């Protein structure tokens, strides 16, 4: 476990005279442009694990403040199979398994992945513009727009901050100060009615239909793209207008060869304004101090694990 990296460090402490301007440009394009970017060629095959973690942490200084990714306060997450999907529960976070991850966003302004090892087969990364999905549904099924902007209960997947309920309300479509922020998390909507039937109403037929229409629209080849990312590739995504997924994968047999990614959840200080109801999940809406699973905003008290761990205390 690494805890020595400074939470007060700035770009001046990690100078990158050539790469730094490119990192800033990619982040700007993610925040106010196309919403995603890919950087290729980091020499992770010859770096040690600690070197990879330090380099990736250095990238974060150019992109935003790190946020806790689970109740163990991981600031750099390890996306790797640590739970056999045949034994996984409905509340297990899918990034810990080899099962396909449906279209979703992460609980941060920006999310980044650094690819250390790829799977034997599968594990494709998919991206789609949630703004394009919205426009297409508005064109073809305008009756579903009020449904998507209505009340949606989401499960916390057993990561419940003190004083909070195991579920919360967050609309899919959120208009605020000139921005349309779209929060989409398939599989998180279906759980609360099943787990808390006395508190959470079942999904309506209109909501069920809206989920299916969203899935079908996002998966259209003229709307989504799929990429086979290689070791040393870094992706950066804006969660407010890009949804992403991952196909199921078959992993290598040897433990040293298994699919392994590092992940950052980031909150830039110049991020867009968000409505107050995001606070229930994000712990606040102040840019630079929001996001994560709601236990604490900001990097203070966080840790940098060297290897994948089960991030949920209760699986």
Q: What role is predicted for each listed range?
A:
Residues 56-66:
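A short alpha->loop->secondary-structure connector
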């Amino acid at each position: 476990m690494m805890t020595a990296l400074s939470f007060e460090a700035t770009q001046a402490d990690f100078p990158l005279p050539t790469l730094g301007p490119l990192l800033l440009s990619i982040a700007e394009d993610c925040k106010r442009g196309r919403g995603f970017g890919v950087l290729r060629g980091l020499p992770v095959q010859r770096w040690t694990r600690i070197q990879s973690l330090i380099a990736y942490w250095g990238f974060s200084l150019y992109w935003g403040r790190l946020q806790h990714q689970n109740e163990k306060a991981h600031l750099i997450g390890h996306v790797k199979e640590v739970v056999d999907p045949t034994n996984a529960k409905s509340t297990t976070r899918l990034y810990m398994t080899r099962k396909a991850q449906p279209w979703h966003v992460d609980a941060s302004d920006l999310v980044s992945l650094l690819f250390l090892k790829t799977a034997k087969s599968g594990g494709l990364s998919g991206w789609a513009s949630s703004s394009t999905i919205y426009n297409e549904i508005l064109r073809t099924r305008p009756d579903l727009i009020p449904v998507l902007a209505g009340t949606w209960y989401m499960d916390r997947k057993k990561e419940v901050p003190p004083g909070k309920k195991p579920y919360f309300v967050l609309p899919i479509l959120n208009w605020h100060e000139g921005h349309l922020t779209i929060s989409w998390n398939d599989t998180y909507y279906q759980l609360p009615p099943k787990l808390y039937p006395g508190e959470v109403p079942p999904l309506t037929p209109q909501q069920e239909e809206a989920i299916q229409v969203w899935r079908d629209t996002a998966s259209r080849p003229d709307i989504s793209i799929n990429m086979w990312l290689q070791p040393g590739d870094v992706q950066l995504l804006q969660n407010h207008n890009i949804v992403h997924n991952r196909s199921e994968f078959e992993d290598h047999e040897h433990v040293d060869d298994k699919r392994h990614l590092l992940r950052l959840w980031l909150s830039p200080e110049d991020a867009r304004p968000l409505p107050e109801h995001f606070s229930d999940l994000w712990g606040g809406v102040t840019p630079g101090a929001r996001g994560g699973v709601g236990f604490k905003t900001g990097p203070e008290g966080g840790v940098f694990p060297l290897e994948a761990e089960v991030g949920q205390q209760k699986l």
